[in-house]
């Protein structure tokens, strides 16, 4: 954990540089904290500002903003307790349980029946103070990178397990990626436009990656990543390469 002395030492070093490229994931990196520190010290950095980063890292806040604009998203319940079964007002064949503010699918679980929700909630609460319980939407995993207010090639993700969890994201060979995704022209352009609209309504800057499920001819917004991964196997560079960037 960083204390104030550690932050002061880091800032002293950062101030000797012209620009800071943030390549952090999870808390401190994606939740607006480092963005706030850099902004207050007039240090330029990549990506979205403090407010946008904070809102986008908080999944329930993100969903509320997006759903209030009429965009489809899985029904959900936000809680800080595992005693919540009586309060969930939607039925689902399965349930997605995940920390409300985390990344990389840490603490993520798919629950096959209502009775097993509590165990999954306990796991998610190990990683955050609150949990999102979502309706399970079966369908194709679709993601749209955005760069400078322009949608990049759409990518479809095919996890071998059928669920795009931590293992599917970070273990070689566990997922197949199709870029560009095979969609008819109307749907392809629609999901690009939808992703760009979400990027703008959440006041993201420079770049982001917007995730969807495609089911029964509809796209359901899942979440947005304001600091997409930039490794050789990450999705954003894959789309950028297809778009013509070296």
Give residue spans per PLM region.
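Conserved metal-phosphate-binding beta-hairpin within the catalytic cores
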Residues: 135, 199-232, 240
